[in-house]
Each structure stands twice: as structure tokens, then as C-alpha cells.
């Protein structure tokens, strides 16, 4: 499929702000030689928030959250809250006390909310135990607590009915390829902020007026996501769909060689600066993989005016 040349920067600067449809970036964690680089992280956050990102989501899956120490998560929280106005910190831990400690720290640093995966790894936790984890987290802070629902990673689906039963969830990030699944949270939790977490459903999420999207592509193409949102707001569904298809081409290419590591290279390809590297077990792309990725997205890049 061919796509029109799209001058995103100019369009973004002219377009009206659409506050009800937020772009949330699950920001990458920037490492150099296996060590966290907070300054590089903050500079990356400043760049993407200047180009359409509304909220920064720290220590999520794209940010390699489960592989970070508590101290590293705190350092990222410091860097994020100093660089961005709106920050959500993902606090999940197999140590519930550490999750609560990070949530309290995030609140003290000015984060607007915290989020958490359900307790994972332990396959037979009861619903009562899951509920206690979230209720203890909610009781520990006064800022909103988001459910981060990611069944493919956690092995458990805390669906809309279950989320309502928790009684304290004020937001949801649903990493799910089923838009109907995500929409159900708006039905059962109408006052909650509900985001879908799939790059392939950015257009669809905006079209049905979810509160926003949490899209890893916001790290490397925030302008494209802003273009989709603006097209939906203007009623230009054909344009929005065309932009989604362009995004799909890029994401599918990156998934071919390991998406979590490819995001770092895509930042350099599309934003023009080096964003560090991931850390094992998400290992950096090798030179051959980087060359393959650049060739694979070259056609898509040629159709963007960035």
C-alpha cells in the first residue's frame, strides 16, 4: 500500500490539541555499558514530550521494568518527573513491600499516578491475594492506581469485571489485541482512564474515544501518533487509517528481529539521536540486525517528513 508524504511536524504544530485522547509513551530505559544513563533518559523524554506525547510511563515493559532494581526505578522516576509534567510510574514487583515503597516514592516526586501489573510468576495466587495486593497499593498512596493488564506476560487476565471488584482502580492500561476487551473497562469503570497498549490499535483506540493509547512507537514516532489522533479528531478516517497502516509496517519489521531491542535503533533512525541500548536479557541488536532493520523501514521513512 502506498502512503502520502506526510509533513508531520507542520501538521502537529497547526493542529488543535485533543486532550481527551492522550498519547502515553512507555519510555525506553537508556543504558550505556549496562548502567543506567539518567541524563540521556531525561533528554529523550524532553524530545518526545515536545512532539505530541502527553504522559510518560516509566518502567513498563518497553522500559524493561521487571529487569530493573528498585534503586534504578527510583532514579528513573527522578529523571522523568524532572523532565516531564505528567508521569505514571509502573511499580510492579514480586516483593510487595518494594512495590509500595516505589509507589510512595513516585508520589513524593510528583508522579500523577502509579500502575502495576498483577503479581506474576506465582501461577496459583487466589483472587483474594491479587485483590489484597492492589488494595494495599491503593491504600499506600493518594494518587490514582492503574491496573496494568498484560495477560500475555503475566499469565492472568484481570478483566473489567475483576477490576471493578477491586474497588480502587482509577485507570487501566490494557495490553491486549482485543479492542472489545479494553472497551469493557469503560463499561464497568466509567470514571477510570482507560488506555489500550497495542501499537496496532492506535487508530481504533482513538476512533472509539478511549482515553488514550500507551504505544511503544511514541519513543520513535510521536509525530505519527499525533497525526493519527489529529486525523481522527478532524473526522479524516481515511488518513488516520493510512497512517496506522504505515505504523504497522514499521512495527512488523521491528518484531521480526526482536521488538524490545529494535526500539532503541528506531529512535536513532527516526529521531536522529542515539538512545543508548537495552540490557540483558534484552540484548542489543548486532550490526547485521541493525542494517536489516534500517533497510526494512527505509521505504516507510521516505514517506515521512520529519
Swiss-Prot record:
Pfam families: DHDPS. Its EC number is 4.1.2.14, 4.1.2.51. InterPro entries: Aldolase_TIM, DapA-like, ED_pathway_aldolase. The keyword Hydrolase does not apply. It catalyses: 2-dehydro-3-deoxy-6-phospho-D-gluconate = D-glyceraldehyde 3-phosphate + pyruvate; 2-dehydro-3-deoxy-D-gluconate = D-glyceraldehyde + pyruvate. Keywords: Carbohydrate metabolism, Lyase, Schiff base. The record marks 148 as: Proton shuttle. Pathway: Carbohydrate acid metabolism; 2-dehydro-3-deoxy-D-gluconate degradation; D-glyceraldehyde 3-phosphate and pyruvate from 2-dehydro-3-deoxy-D-gluconate: step 2/2. One of its GO terms (molecular function) is 2-dehydro-3-deoxy-D-gluconate aldolase activity. The active site is at residue 173. Gene3D superfamilies: Aldolase class I (3.20.20.70). Substrate binds at residues 61-62, 148-150, 173-175. It comes from the Archaea. NCBIfam families: Arch_KDGaldase. Homotetramer; dimer of dimers. Involved in the degradation of glucose via the Entner-Doudoroff pathway. Catalyzes the reversible cleavage of 2-keto-3-deoxy-6-phosphogluconate (KDPG) and 2-keto-3-deoxygluconate (KDG) forming pyruvate and glyceraldehyde 3-phosphate or glyceraldehyde, respectively. It is not able to use 2-keto-3-deoxy-6-phosphogalactonate (KDPGal) and 2-keto-3-deoxygalactonate (KDGal) as substrate. Belongs to the DapA family. KDPG aldolase subfamily. This is 2-dehydro-3-deoxy-D-gluconate/2-dehydro-3-deoxy-phosphogluconate aldolase. The gene is kdgA.
